Design a protein with these regions (language model features):
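Loop-helix junctions at membrane interfaces
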Residues: 5-217
């Protein structure tokens, strides 16, 4: 039977995701390209957002799959993807962040064979990014409050991931789902710390800063 190395399979799916969104962006950009200068700029911004969303979706997928620690009592696992999920909402905004975080995270479950978690992960991780983006928009007016927005996004991640997965797993595994709560809390804390470290480094990159939610002109 034909087999593909696991790492190559992950890269293959991530590359396909980026190419799909990029080609869609080009198509939509050409379709929406109008004579007025303002509308042309909007099409370019739309293209830029799609490319950024594709990149962050791929990052979320890879980060989720780098390290997996199985959680007792369920078929789930602890991973490092939460940091990217938080940053999806902060950097891309609520809507694009929801899509990038949800798609990238559930793609990791799909590739890893955690099929029962695919829809659950899409909703929960998408909601984390959505809420993180909304909080960031509400308070991220200065450098200090932007950083506070990232921290609050991490707190949201801890609550939604630990609570959301417990509720969903309870209907699947029963009382054994409670065993995953400590692991999900640890995962959320790790996501908070890592996202707080990565945020200033990412924003320092001109392309990401100029494309980021909250830094738009």
């Amino acid at each position: 039977m034909f087999s593909v190395p696991f790492d190559n399979l992950v890269l293959y799916f991530c590359r396909k995701l980026i190419l799909f969104l990029y080609s869609k962006a080009i198509y939509d950009g050409k379709r929406n390209l109008l004579i007025k200068r303002g509308e042309i700029i909007m099409s370019r911004e739309y293209l830029k957002k799609l490319i950024m969303a594709a990149l962050f979706a791929a990052l979320a997928c890879v980060a989720t799959m780098i390290i997996k620690v199985p959680t007792p009592g369920t078929e789930g696992y602890i991973n490092l993807g939460d940091a990217i999920v938080i940053l999806c909402g902060v950097i891309l905004g609520p809507v694009w962040g929801f899509l990038a975080a949800g798609i990238g995270s559930c793609l990791a479950d799909l590739i890893g064979g955690y099929f029962v978690y695919v829809p659950i992960t899409f909703v929960i991780k998408g909601l984390v990014a959505l809420c993180a983006g909304l909080v960031y928009r509400a308070i991220g007016k200065t450098k200090t409050t932007r950083y506070a927005g990232v921290i609050l996004g991490g707190v949201i991640d801890i609550i939604l991931v630990a609570g959301g997965y417990f509720v969903c797993e309870y209907f699947i595994y029963g009382a054994g789902a409670a065993a995953s709560i400590p692991g999900n809390i640890i995962q959320g804390i790790g996501g908070l710390v890592i996202s707080a470290i990565l945020y200033p480094a990412l924003i320092a990159i001109p392309y990401i800063r100029n494309s980021s939610y909250g830094f738009e002109n």
